Amino acid sequence: MAFFIASSPHLRSKRSTADVMRWVLVCALPGLIAQTYFFGYGTLIQLLLAISVAVALEAGIMLLRKRSPISALRDYSAVVTAWLLAVAIPPLSPWWVVVIGLIFAIVIAKHLYGGLGQNPFNPAMIAYVVLLISFPVQMTSWMAPIKLTAEPSSLVDSFSLIFGGFDSDGLSLQQIRTGIDGITMATPLDAIKTSLKAGHTMSETLTQPQFSGFAGIGWEWVNIAYLLGGLILLKLRIIRWHIPVAMLAGLVFTALLAQLFAPGTTASPMIHLLSGATMLGAFFIATDPVSASTTDKGRLIYGFFIGAMVFLIRSWGGFPDGVAFAVLLANMCVPLIDYYTKPRTYGH
Protein backbone atom coordinates (compact mmCIF):
# COMPACT_ATOMS: atom_id res chain seq x y z
CA MET A 1 0.00 0.00 0.00
CA ALA A 2 1.35 3.41 -0.97
CA PHE A 3 1.28 6.20 1.59
CA PHE A 4 1.44 9.82 0.54
CA ILE A 5 2.90 12.55 2.71
CA ALA A 6 1.28 15.97 2.37
CA SER A 7 1.87 19.21 4.19
CA SER A 8 -0.76 20.88 6.32
CA PRO A 9 -3.51 21.95 6.39
CA HIS A 10 -5.05 18.49 6.28
CA LEU A 11 -8.59 19.71 6.97
CA ARG A 12 -9.75 21.81 4.05
CA SER A 13 -12.87 23.87 3.49
CA LYS A 14 -15.14 22.83 0.64
CA ARG A 15 -15.53 26.48 -0.34
CA SER A 16 -13.07 27.96 -2.77
CA THR A 17 -12.06 31.63 -2.86
CA ALA A 18 -14.43 32.14 -5.77
CA ASP A 19 -17.33 30.62 -3.79
CA VAL A 20 -16.67 32.94 -0.85
CA MET A 21 -16.44 36.01 -3.08
CA ARG A 22 -19.65 35.10 -4.90
CA TRP A 23 -21.52 34.78 -1.62
CA VAL A 24 -20.17 38.15 -0.50
CA LEU A 25 -21.52 39.70 -3.69
CA VAL A 26 -24.90 38.01 -3.30
CA CYS A 27 -25.23 39.14 0.32
CA ALA A 28 -24.29 42.70 -0.64
CA LEU A 29 -27.25 42.88 -3.04
CA PRO A 30 -29.80 44.05 -0.41
CA GLY A 31 -27.58 47.04 0.40
CA LEU A 32 -27.09 47.83 -3.28
CA ILE A 33 -30.84 47.72 -3.90
CA ALA A 34 -31.48 50.01 -0.92
CA GLN A 35 -28.84 52.49 -2.06
CA THR A 36 -30.27 52.56 -5.57
CA TYR A 37 -33.80 53.02 -4.24
CA PHE A 38 -32.89 55.94 -1.97
CA PHE A 39 -30.07 57.61 -3.94
CA GLY A 40 -30.83 56.88 -7.57
CA TYR A 41 -29.42 55.10 -10.60
CA GLY A 42 -25.96 56.59 -10.16
CA THR A 43 -25.03 53.75 -7.81
CA LEU A 44 -25.71 51.13 -10.48
CA ILE A 45 -23.80 53.10 -13.13
CA GLN A 46 -20.80 53.48 -10.81
CA LEU A 47 -20.92 49.77 -10.04
CA LEU A 48 -20.95 48.69 -13.69
CA LEU A 49 -18.15 51.12 -14.49
CA ALA A 50 -16.11 49.97 -11.49
CA ILE A 51 -16.45 46.28 -12.33
CA SER A 52 -15.45 46.89 -15.96
CA VAL A 53 -12.37 48.89 -14.96
CA ALA A 54 -11.36 46.45 -12.22
CA VAL A 55 -11.61 43.44 -14.53
CA ALA A 56 -9.56 45.21 -17.21
CA LEU A 57 -6.88 46.25 -14.70
CA GLU A 58 -6.73 42.79 -13.14
CA ALA A 59 -6.33 41.13 -16.53
CA GLY A 60 -3.73 43.66 -17.65
CA ILE A 61 -1.62 43.29 -14.50
CA MET A 62 -1.74 39.49 -14.71
CA LEU A 63 -0.55 39.63 -18.32
CA LEU A 64 2.31 41.93 -17.31
CA ARG A 65 3.23 39.44 -14.59
CA LYS A 66 3.10 36.66 -17.22
CA ARG A 67 0.33 34.83 -15.42
CA SER A 68 -3.06 33.64 -16.55
CA PRO A 69 -5.65 36.43 -16.31
CA ILE A 70 -8.50 33.91 -16.51
CA SER A 71 -7.61 32.22 -13.22
CA ALA A 72 -7.27 35.60 -11.49
CA LEU A 73 -10.63 36.83 -12.76
CA ARG A 74 -12.37 33.62 -11.73
CA ASP A 75 -11.77 34.28 -8.03
CA TYR A 76 -13.98 37.43 -8.18
CA SER A 77 -11.69 39.34 -5.80
CA ALA A 78 -11.37 42.23 -8.26
CA VAL A 79 -15.16 42.40 -8.58
CA VAL A 80 -15.57 42.55 -4.79
CA THR A 81 -13.03 45.38 -4.56
CA ALA A 82 -14.84 47.26 -7.33
CA TRP A 83 -18.20 46.69 -5.64
CA LEU A 84 -17.03 48.02 -2.27
CA LEU A 85 -15.52 51.14 -3.81
CA ALA A 86 -18.53 51.80 -6.06
CA VAL A 87 -21.04 51.79 -3.19
CA ALA A 88 -18.75 53.91 -1.00
CA ILE A 89 -18.46 56.92 -3.31
CA PRO A 90 -21.23 59.44 -4.09
CA PRO A 91 -23.50 58.03 -6.84
CA LEU A 92 -23.02 60.97 -9.21
CA SER A 93 -19.24 61.31 -8.88
CA PRO A 94 -17.37 61.92 -12.17
CA TRP A 95 -16.37 58.74 -13.99
CA TRP A 96 -12.66 59.37 -13.52
CA VAL A 97 -13.00 59.20 -9.72
CA VAL A 98 -13.75 55.49 -9.70
CA VAL A 99 -11.12 54.84 -12.41
CA ILE A 100 -8.36 56.51 -10.39
CA GLY A 101 -9.54 54.75 -7.25
CA LEU A 102 -9.39 51.33 -8.85
CA ILE A 103 -5.91 51.97 -10.25
CA PHE A 104 -4.76 52.49 -6.67
CA ALA A 105 -6.81 49.54 -5.38
CA ILE A 106 -5.87 46.91 -7.97
CA VAL A 107 -2.42 47.98 -9.13
CA ILE A 108 -0.88 49.49 -5.99
CA ALA A 109 -2.76 48.20 -2.94
CA LYS A 110 -3.11 44.65 -4.27
CA HIS A 111 -0.58 43.64 -6.93
CA LEU A 112 2.30 45.81 -5.75
CA TYR A 113 2.36 43.60 -2.65
CA GLY A 114 2.17 40.35 -4.62
CA GLY A 115 -1.49 39.92 -5.47
CA LEU A 116 -4.39 38.16 -3.77
CA GLY A 117 -3.58 37.08 -0.23
CA GLN A 118 -0.46 39.25 0.09
CA ASN A 119 -1.88 42.75 0.62
CA PRO A 120 -1.55 44.10 4.19
CA PHE A 121 -4.21 46.77 3.64
CA ASN A 122 -7.77 46.56 2.35
CA PRO A 123 -7.48 47.63 -1.33
CA ALA A 124 -10.92 49.25 -1.54
CA MET A 125 -10.27 51.34 1.57
CA ILE A 126 -6.85 52.41 0.30
CA ALA A 127 -8.56 53.64 -2.85
CA TYR A 128 -11.30 55.41 -0.89
CA VAL A 129 -8.86 57.26 1.36
CA VAL A 130 -6.67 58.30 -1.58
CA LEU A 131 -9.73 59.67 -3.37
CA LEU A 132 -11.09 61.41 -0.28
CA ILE A 133 -7.80 63.19 0.40
CA SER A 134 -7.11 64.00 -3.26
CA PHE A 135 -10.63 64.97 -4.38
CA PRO A 136 -12.58 66.03 -1.27
CA VAL A 137 -15.22 67.98 -3.23
CA GLN A 138 -16.12 65.11 -5.54
CA MET A 139 -16.01 62.58 -2.70
CA THR A 140 -18.39 64.55 -0.48
CA SER A 141 -20.92 65.59 -3.15
CA TRP A 142 -23.76 63.40 -1.94
CA MET A 143 -27.26 64.15 -3.16
CA ALA A 144 -30.22 64.23 -0.80
CA PRO A 145 -32.31 61.02 -0.75
CA ILE A 146 -34.84 60.79 -3.57
CA LYS A 147 -37.61 61.14 -0.99
CA LEU A 148 -36.51 64.73 -0.34
CA THR A 149 -36.07 65.78 -3.97
CA ALA A 150 -38.83 67.14 -6.19
CA GLU A 151 -37.33 65.80 -9.44
CA PRO A 152 -34.94 62.87 -8.94
CA SER A 153 -32.32 62.36 -11.64
CA SER A 154 -33.42 59.87 -14.28
CA LEU A 155 -31.21 57.09 -15.60
CA VAL A 156 -30.26 59.23 -18.60
CA ASP A 157 -29.54 62.28 -16.43
CA SER A 158 -27.45 60.20 -14.02
CA PHE A 159 -25.42 58.83 -16.93
CA SER A 160 -24.94 62.33 -18.35
CA LEU A 161 -23.85 63.76 -15.00
CA ILE A 162 -21.31 61.00 -14.40
CA PHE A 163 -19.74 61.00 -17.87
CA GLY A 164 -20.41 64.55 -19.05
CA GLY A 165 -20.81 66.66 -15.93
CA PHE A 166 -24.24 68.00 -16.93
CA ASP A 167 -27.77 66.63 -17.09
CA SER A 168 -30.16 66.85 -20.05
CA ASP A 169 -31.17 70.38 -19.00
CA GLY A 170 -27.56 71.58 -18.96
CA LEU A 171 -27.33 71.75 -15.17
CA SER A 172 -24.14 70.70 -13.41
CA LEU A 173 -24.10 68.53 -10.30
CA GLN A 174 -23.27 71.54 -8.13
CA GLN A 175 -26.24 73.47 -9.54
CA ILE A 176 -28.55 70.54 -8.87
CA ARG A 177 -27.23 70.12 -5.32
CA THR A 178 -27.81 73.79 -4.48
CA GLY A 179 -31.17 73.95 -6.23
CA ILE A 180 -33.19 72.10 -3.64
CA ASP A 181 -34.65 74.71 -1.30
CA GLY A 182 -34.37 74.06 2.40
CA ILE A 183 -32.48 70.78 2.11
CA THR A 184 -28.81 70.65 2.94
CA MET A 185 -26.86 68.26 0.74
CA ALA A 186 -24.63 67.11 3.60
CA THR A 187 -24.91 63.52 4.77
CA PRO A 188 -26.51 63.03 8.20
CA LEU A 189 -23.11 62.49 9.83
CA ASP A 190 -21.73 65.64 8.23
CA ALA A 191 -24.84 67.59 9.21
CA ILE A 192 -24.49 66.45 12.83
CA LYS A 193 -20.83 67.45 13.03
CA THR A 194 -21.45 70.85 11.42
CA SER A 195 -24.48 71.58 13.58
CA LEU A 196 -22.77 70.63 16.84
CA LYS A 197 -19.73 72.75 15.98
CA ALA A 198 -22.10 75.67 15.40
CA GLY A 199 -23.34 75.35 18.98
CA HIS A 200 -26.64 73.60 18.33
CA THR A 201 -27.84 70.78 20.54
CA MET A 202 -28.37 67.25 19.29
CA SER A 203 -32.15 67.58 19.57
CA GLU A 204 -32.05 70.74 17.43
CA THR A 205 -29.87 68.99 14.87
CA LEU A 206 -32.32 66.12 14.49
CA THR A 207 -35.08 68.52 13.41
CA GLN A 208 -33.35 68.98 10.03
CA PRO A 209 -35.27 67.48 7.08
CA GLN A 210 -32.80 64.69 6.29
CA PHE A 211 -33.35 63.00 9.66
CA SER A 212 -36.13 60.54 10.43
CA GLY A 213 -37.04 58.44 13.45
CA PHE A 214 -33.75 56.62 14.00
CA ALA A 215 -31.14 58.24 11.78
CA GLY A 216 -30.83 59.88 8.37
CA ILE A 217 -33.57 59.23 5.82
CA GLY A 218 -32.42 56.47 3.50
CA TRP A 219 -29.20 55.77 5.37
CA GLU A 220 -30.95 53.81 8.11
CA TRP A 221 -32.52 51.43 5.58
CA VAL A 222 -29.27 51.07 3.68
CA ASN A 223 -27.56 50.01 6.91
CA ILE A 224 -30.38 47.63 7.79
CA ALA A 225 -30.05 46.08 4.32
CA TYR A 226 -26.31 45.54 4.79
CA LEU A 227 -27.01 44.15 8.26
CA LEU A 228 -29.38 41.62 6.69
CA GLY A 229 -26.73 40.61 4.17
CA GLY A 230 -24.14 40.38 6.93
CA LEU A 231 -26.34 38.08 9.01
CA ILE A 232 -26.67 35.79 5.99
CA LEU A 233 -22.87 35.71 5.70
CA LEU A 234 -22.69 34.72 9.36
CA LYS A 235 -25.38 32.07 8.93
CA LEU A 236 -23.49 30.56 6.00
CA ARG A 237 -20.21 30.79 7.96
CA ILE A 238 -18.61 32.83 5.21
CA ILE A 239 -17.35 35.21 7.90
CA ARG A 240 -16.74 34.77 11.63
CA TRP A 241 -18.78 36.68 14.21
CA HIS A 242 -15.84 38.14 16.13
CA ILE A 243 -14.99 41.18 13.99
CA PRO A 244 -18.49 42.53 13.20
CA VAL A 245 -19.76 42.03 16.74
CA ALA A 246 -16.62 43.56 18.28
CA MET A 247 -16.71 46.51 15.88
CA LEU A 248 -20.35 47.31 16.62
CA ALA A 249 -19.69 46.83 20.34
CA GLY A 250 -16.74 49.23 20.20
CA LEU A 251 -18.84 51.82 18.39
CA VAL A 252 -21.75 51.53 20.83
CA PHE A 253 -19.49 51.50 23.91
CA THR A 254 -17.61 54.66 22.96
CA ALA A 255 -20.83 56.42 21.93
CA LEU A 256 -22.44 55.57 25.28
CA LEU A 257 -19.31 56.66 27.13
CA ALA A 258 -19.35 60.01 25.34
CA GLN A 259 -23.03 60.52 26.11
CA LEU A 260 -22.38 59.74 29.76
CA PHE A 261 -19.72 62.42 30.13
CA ALA A 262 -20.99 64.91 27.53
CA PRO A 263 -24.73 64.40 27.04
CA GLY A 264 -26.30 66.19 24.10
CA THR A 265 -23.00 66.92 22.36
CA THR A 266 -22.56 63.65 20.43
CA ALA A 267 -24.81 61.42 18.36
CA SER A 268 -26.57 58.49 20.00
CA PRO A 269 -25.40 54.90 19.48
CA MET A 270 -28.47 54.23 17.32
CA ILE A 271 -27.56 57.07 14.96
CA HIS A 272 -24.00 55.77 14.69
CA LEU A 273 -25.19 52.23 13.99
CA LEU A 274 -27.61 53.28 11.25
CA SER A 275 -25.57 56.04 9.58
CA GLY A 276 -22.75 56.13 7.09
CA ALA A 277 -20.98 52.88 6.24
CA THR A 278 -21.35 51.22 9.65
CA MET A 279 -22.93 47.91 8.62
CA LEU A 280 -21.09 47.78 5.30
CA GLY A 281 -17.86 48.26 7.22
CA ALA A 282 -18.67 45.75 9.95
CA PHE A 283 -19.71 42.83 7.74
CA PHE A 284 -18.13 43.42 4.33
CA ILE A 285 -14.99 45.54 4.81
CA ALA A 286 -13.47 44.87 8.23
CA THR A 287 -13.92 41.11 7.76
CA ASP A 288 -11.48 40.96 4.83
CA PRO A 289 -9.62 37.72 5.65
CA VAL A 290 -6.32 38.90 4.17
CA SER A 291 -5.82 42.19 6.01
CA ALA A 292 -7.66 41.35 9.26
CA SER A 293 -6.34 39.64 12.37
CA THR A 294 -6.13 35.84 12.22
CA THR A 295 -6.69 34.78 15.85
CA ASP A 296 -10.04 34.78 17.65
CA LYS A 297 -8.83 37.03 20.44
CA GLY A 298 -7.06 39.21 17.90
CA ARG A 299 -10.25 39.56 15.85
CA LEU A 300 -12.10 40.85 18.90
CA ILE A 301 -9.39 43.43 19.61
CA TYR A 302 -9.19 44.33 15.92
CA GLY A 303 -12.95 44.83 15.60
CA PHE A 304 -13.31 46.78 18.83
CA PHE A 305 -10.46 49.07 17.81
CA ILE A 306 -12.17 49.80 14.48
CA GLY A 307 -15.48 50.60 16.19
CA ALA A 308 -13.85 52.94 18.69
CA MET A 309 -11.86 54.71 15.97
CA VAL A 310 -14.98 55.14 13.83
CA PHE A 311 -16.66 56.98 16.70
CA LEU A 312 -13.63 59.15 17.44
CA ILE A 313 -13.16 60.17 13.80
CA ARG A 314 -16.87 60.83 13.30
CA SER A 315 -17.08 62.94 16.43
CA TRP A 316 -13.82 64.90 16.39
CA GLY A 317 -11.98 64.07 13.17
CA GLY A 318 -11.81 66.06 9.98
CA PHE A 319 -14.09 63.73 7.99
CA PRO A 320 -17.76 62.88 8.55
CA ASP A 321 -17.32 59.10 8.41
CA GLY A 322 -14.32 57.22 9.72
CA VAL A 323 -14.79 53.62 8.59
CA ALA A 324 -12.07 53.65 5.91
CA PHE A 325 -9.49 55.36 8.12
CA ALA A 326 -10.34 53.11 11.07
CA VAL A 327 -9.96 49.94 8.99
CA LEU A 328 -6.59 51.03 7.59
CA LEU A 329 -5.31 51.98 11.06
CA ALA A 330 -6.40 48.57 12.32
CA ASN A 331 -4.68 46.89 9.34
CA MET A 332 -1.45 48.55 10.45
CA CYS A 333 -1.87 47.06 13.92
CA VAL A 334 -2.61 43.50 12.75
CA PRO A 335 1.00 42.18 13.02
CA LEU A 336 1.23 43.50 16.59
CA ILE A 337 -2.21 42.15 17.52
CA ASP A 338 -1.46 38.71 16.06
CA TYR A 339 1.93 38.59 17.78
CA TYR A 340 0.44 39.07 21.25
CA THR A 341 -2.68 36.96 20.70
CA LYS A 342 -1.25 33.92 18.92
CA PRO A 343 -2.16 30.66 20.69
CA ARG A 344 0.57 29.21 22.87
CA THR A 345 1.92 25.79 21.99
CA TYR A 346 0.79 23.13 24.45
CA GLY A 347 3.49 22.55 27.04
CA HIS A 348 5.20 25.94 26.61
Swiss-Prot record:
Record keyword Acyltransferase present: no
FMN phosphoryl threonine, modified sites: 187
Ranges annotated as spanning the membrane: 23-43, 44-64, 72-91, 95-117, 126-146, 214-234, 243-263, 266-286, 300-320, 321-341
Reported cofactor(s): FMN
Membrane topology (Cytoplasmic): 1-22, 65-71, 118-125, 235-242, 287-299, 342-348
Organism: Vibrio cholerae serotype O1 (strain ATCC 39541 / Classical Ogawa 395 / O395)
Gene name tied to this protein: rnfD
GO biological process: electron transport chain; transmembrane transport
GO CC terms, sorted: plasma membrane
EC number: 7.-.-.-
Assigned keywords, A-Z: Cell inner membrane, Cell membrane, Electron transport, Flavoprotein, FMN, Membrane, Phosphoprotein, Translocase, Transmembrane, Transmembrane helix, Transport
InterPro entries (alphabetical): NqrB/RnfD, RnfD_bac
Topological domain ranges for the Periplasmic compartment: 92-94, 147-213, 264-265
Protein topology in the membrane: Multi-pass membrane protein
Species classification: Bacteria, Pseudomonadati, Pseudomonadota, Gammaproteobacteria, Vibrionales
Compartments (UniProt record): Cell inner membrane
UniProt keyword Membrane present: yes
Coiled-coil ranges from the UniProt annotation: none
Its biological purpose: Part of a membrane-bound complex that couples electron transfer with translocation of ions across the membrane.
Top EC class of this enzyme: translocase
Superkingdom of this protein's organism: Bacteria
Pfam families for this protein: NQR2_RnfD_RnfE
Designated name of the protein: Ion-translocating oxidoreductase complex subunit D
Family: Belongs to the NqrB/RnfD family.
Subunit: The complex is composed of six subunits: RnfA, RnfB, RnfC, RnfD, RnfE and RnfG.
